[in-house]
């Protein structure tokens, strides 16, 4: 999916808006968008950002001792 930066957007803000998190996805988005890091922390308005599909981490099952 392709999205475009809004005024004052940072890459992590875009990742949170689309993926709901930044952990493990910012690096993937940077890899899919060569040259994006050179634009600076605040992306110019209208910058196209390709958002690749990201694998979700498996949810670890927890056990409560007092159930």
UniProtKB/Swiss-Prot annotation:
GO terms for cellular component: virus tail, baseplate. It is found in: Virion. Pfam families: Phage_tail_X. It comes from the Viruses. InterPro entries: GpX-like (IPR008861). Keywords: Late protein, Viral baseplate protein, Viral tail protein, Virion. This is Baseplate protein X. The keyword tRNA-binding does not apply. Might be involved in the peptidoglycan digestion during virus entry into the host cell. It comes from Escherichia phage P2. Induction: Expressed in the late phase of the viral replicative cycle.
